[in-house]
Amino acid sequence: MDVVRTPDARFQNLVGYPFAAHYVDVAATDTPHLRMHYIDEGPADGPPIVLLHGEPTWSYLYRTMIPPLAAGGYRVLAPDLIGFGRSDKPTRIADYTYLRHVEWVKSWFEELRLAEATLFVQDWGSLIGLRVAAEHGDAIARLVVANGFLPTARGRTPTAFHIWRAFARYSPVLPAGRLVAAGTVRKVPPAVRAGYDAPFPDKSYQAGARAFPQLVPISPDDPAVAANRAAWDALGRWEKPFLAIFGERDPLLGRADRPLIKHIPGAAGQPHARINANHFIQEDSGPELAERIISWQ
């Protein structure tokens, strides 16, 4: 497995991202150890909250949520998934599998010895995080999902997703900043778009981002389907607090909160919300998300 690391110089002086870098080695069952980057802010003895990003972003997505959550007393941890941000990046699309991503995040939880954590997930963060919660639930006390879901290959896949999947694999460019800007309500300034582009100096660093759409299980014979269906069944027995906060302007996932709220017992009586945001709800409404989490006791 060939691995690249984005040069540190790419992350200097990014707008709104003054956080110190932390690293830990993680491994999947069938991979060597890889270096995973994460943010660790707020009081070390505060209740941990883990913020898990998705495609094609990194912990930069949480830059407006981290300070208020830390000020609210949380120990705020935001990892970069393998292939993203400042984490190691295997160079082949085939190096990435759904199971490996789940195992890398589980390994990260174990290395940090996290317990009683609040887990906030969005986009691919939910595809990974909901599996982790279902399979490693003793580390997680509360779940928050924003514009995410757990695919089980039941039902029709929108044509728009097939187009996105082909674009991600075959397009000569994968402009992360412009993709984020296309999924927000508010205008994303060029300097912020540059922050999303920072991890990807050229195509050799993009295999992880190009792989993610290919890994969404949309066919019943996908190797991830059995584990996802088992995780969905386990979430049907999840009685710990569960909160859904969705951006209602998201054309694909704006209503994906409904099956989650209906299925998960811990969702009953919680202050779920749909707010004026698009898919990248953290970019549109980061401080509001932080405030809703802080007030959710």
From Swiss-Prot:
* Reaction it catalyzes: 1-haloalkane + H2O = a halide anion + a primary alcohol + H(+)
Give the Gene Ontology MF terms in alphabetical order: epoxide hydrolase activity; haloalkane dehalogenase activity
Q: Which residues form the active site?
A: 123 (nucleophile), 250 (proton donor), 279 (proton acceptor)
Entry keyword set: Hydrolase
Does this entry carry the keyword Hydrolase? yes
Instruction: Give the superkingdom in one word.
Output: Bacteria
* Quaternary structure and partners: Monomer.
This chain's function reads: Catalyzes hydrolytic cleavage of carbon-halogen bonds in halogenated aliphatic compounds, leading to the formation of the corresponding primary alcohols, halide ions and protons.
Which family does the record assign? Belongs to the haloalkane dehalogenase family. Type 1 subfamily.
This protein's name: Haloalkane dehalogenase
The opening ranks of the lineage are: Bacteria, Bacillati, Actinomycetota, Actinomycetes, Mycobacteriales
Gene symbol of the encoding locus: dhmA
